[in-house]
């Protein structure tokens, strides 16, 4: 009753009743007149930082989403088209919002649905000449071919620098992403050795996603043929937990806020083994967050350039 009396008092107030009474038929035109008096002001885009999200990582598929204020870019597209779209959907990303897809090399776990995705979504497809040749992309899709150490504009406010790395017979590249505020994030997988060139670039990054593919003892005791063991552990293979730990020990710097260990072998590694090996090497110098990216993602995102916690569960 008190609320009803209060509303009655307000409705009888002569000041409130000064607004003109408008019939239903007139209301639309009245609203248009009111809106026409509003002065449009330029809206500045809000800097939300750079978001790094692993959609999944491992021998059955790899893809990383980089999001900024105005751009969405995929590094690799190694799942089925349906699988990629489902993963993006969990993040609230409409596939048509993907500006570019950069494929690091031709192996299926990195390139599987890249062409189909680019055609369906209207995204730019980016690769080096060797990958484009092996995948037979030339002339069948809108393709941007890059050279070694070339910086590519992948979206309105993000560029990608490609750094060659040794891996089998593939012309593989590591990717250094840079937004318009100068923040850098690296995605580094499928390499048997961390080169001096790569180290120099990683020392400038605030986020590093890097593979820790196998535990050496576990690989050697496992059931793989000796030839495959040699390939995996060779210069053109993958990084072991030990190699990754040693590389990060050299790379870690005060501005490095997050590390993700990725592309872990399901047969020759375990998450806690990779994590403990790396922590033993960097625990005295690294104060950021260390995470493991698994095959079935997305599980979490990392943010650069925000005051919020850098790791956010998806």
Give each language-model segment a name.
Residues 34, 128-182:
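Metallo-beta-lactamase
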Residues 18, 29-91, 173-190, 207:
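Conserved beta-strand hairpin/beta-sheet module of binuclear metal-dependent hydrolase folds
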Residues 56-57, 77-79, 106, 165-168, ...:
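Active-site metal-binding loops of divalent metal-dependent hydrolases
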Residues 75-78, 99-106, 126-129, 186-189, ...:
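Active-site neighborhood of phospho(di)ester-bond hydrolases with catalytic His/Asp-centered motifs
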Residues 81-127:
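Active-site metal-binding motif and surrounding structural segment of the metallo-beta-lactamase
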Residues 3-9, 13, 18-22, 26-30, ...:
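C-terminal regulatory/interaction regions
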Residues 196-294:
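Cap/insert and terminal regions of metallo-dependent hydrolase folds
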Residues 53-63, 106-114, 132, 136, ...:
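Structured catalytic core of nucleotide-sugar glycosyltransferases
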